[in-house]
């Protein structure tokens, strides 16, 4: 679509107008709408006339299906009910739907939309304290415990992260690769080693839903309390994969130890 060739500011403006339209399905009008994240998805803060805040996420580039989004909603609602971890609540429309499917007029593209309750605080970001990382580690453990026996409905489905690229396109080894044969060969060795360990983990570990995107911009800190959000990348995996993602974003052995202990 030519829409996605437009300057980012124009895209945001158009999607903000679309957000106002979508909010009528939730019985919300005259809200203040501001873009807070624009990338894989467009996320808007919504403040109603009475001061209640929400986060509205429009999936603009995501390959997620309605079944994937339904799985995300089912899992987060399960965590809302059972978990000692603070997570945002999915918000239903007036028709009691948690997912809205609507055509964005300016792009002509059908987009899937979800809305969550607002989380107060600041992102932990890329300079977390050791205390914060200790809380993150505890929260990941609780999330895993609460998810180990959770079962999705028949209408919902998620990918399983047992392939090297986690269901994304292969630009390393396919015909689209720009690598030299020598580089490809070296990466193939790394690939084979990684898949050997991955296959072993999948053979010996419990597989359940994982968050799969634990980093400082998906973790909120407010008055000493941690919240976890952005469940858009969740899928079936092993617990070590959640930890590997979280550790990837850390810089020092002290940080690693704080997360893991």
Could you say what each language-model-derived stretch is?
Residues 49-152:
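ATP-binding pocket architecture of kinase catalytic cores
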Residues 124-184, 207:
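A cross-family kinase active-site recognition segment
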Residues 240-261:
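Active-site activation/catalytic loop segments of kinase-like enzymes and analogous catalytic loops
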